[in-house]
């Protein structure tokens, strides 16, 4: 396994920032690491990268124990922290040259040119980092993480500060890197995780609450289907709440409703019966699986 953590615990006095979590990430996997603010995501990432020592438990990167061999594990990792520390007085190419020296990168000019092209920094490469927008500063951090061609990428909020077009570009970079490397990344933009990852790990209050393929999580939640219905006429919300098998009703807009259920076929059948009995016109009726956002809310609002 490229990343493995076992019974990881990090305490600050009586507070358990990370509480006995275990998971593995294999080569070629892109795994989304999710949790609300303060859940322990960044703490876990800092332990895996060797920037923070755990209270108990163990972490390995490419089979190397992080606590016992922090320098060797850092050579295997490309790390983009949430707070991307950069030298603002250095030029982009100058900074990447410094990072190349730190990692003793062979053929540094070629590698620097390659990551600049890959991360879309070419037009900004002759500027000082302090002159760049937040989005381009984020790209510099990602370029630095990729420069020494690491086996493992750990990215904490990699699309923070990017505009929609830039997000799509960086998403493609991450997906491409994930074909050959191990990628663990956190994001508050759940749509990004859905677009990039097949598997997600969710932690809440320092504890692991989910670790599975996204498709399995969508199937496994007890109320994992949504029926979307739009009427031509106004319908009382209470009528829909009384439908057998409906666990929740949310009014989306005028005459449109979202119904939570684990039996969408039964609910749709009853909606058609109600429409027939009350002489109502249904404009649209469709089923969708539970989104990552709703799964996340259900698992972290406990």
What residues fall within each predicted segment?
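Short, Lys/Arg-enriched, disordered terminal segments
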Residues: 1-3, 301-302
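ABC transporter nucleotide-binding domains
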Residues: 2-5, 10-204, 208-210
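ABC transporter nucleotide-binding domain
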Residues: 169-262
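Non-catalytic surface loops within mature trypsin-like serine protease
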Residues: 27, 104, 123, 231-233, ...
């Amino acid at each position: 396994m490229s990343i493995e953590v076992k019974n990881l615990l990090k305490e600050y006095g009586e507070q358990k920032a990370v509480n006995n979590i275990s998971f593995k990430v294999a080569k070629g996997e892109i795994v989304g690491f999710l949790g609300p603010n303060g859940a322990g995501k960044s703490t876990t990432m800092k332990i895996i990268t060797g920037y923070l020592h755990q209270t108990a438990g163990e972490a390995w990167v490419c089979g190397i124990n992080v606590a016992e061999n922090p320098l060797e594990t850092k050579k295997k990792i490309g790390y983009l922290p949430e707070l991307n520390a950069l030298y603002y007085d250095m030029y982009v190419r100058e900074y990447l040259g410094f990072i190349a020296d730190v990692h003793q990168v062979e053929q540094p000019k070629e590698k620097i040119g390659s990551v600049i092209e890959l991360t879309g920094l070419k037009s900004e490469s002759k500027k000082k980092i302090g002159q760049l927008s937040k989005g381009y500063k984020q790209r510099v951090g990602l370029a630095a993480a990729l420069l020494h061609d690491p086996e493992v990428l750990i990215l904490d909020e990699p699309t923070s500060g990017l505009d929609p077009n830039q997000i799509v570009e960086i998403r493609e970079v991450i997906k491409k890197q994930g074909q050959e490397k191990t990628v663990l990344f956190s994001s508050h933009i759940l749509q990004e995780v859905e677009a990039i990852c097949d598997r997600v790990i969710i932690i809440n209050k320092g504890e692991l609450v989910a670790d599975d393929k996204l498709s399995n999580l969508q199937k496994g939640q007890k109320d994992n289907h949504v029926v979307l219905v739009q009427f031509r006429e106004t319908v009382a919300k209470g009528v829909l709440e009384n439908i057998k098998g409906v666990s929740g009703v949310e009014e989306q807009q005028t005459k449109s409703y979202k119904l939570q259920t684990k039996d969408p076929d039964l609910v749709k059948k009853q909606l058609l019966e109600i429409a027939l009995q009350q002489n109502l016109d249904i404009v649209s009726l469709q089923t969708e699986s539970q989104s990552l956002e709703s799964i996340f809310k259900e698992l972290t609002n406990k």
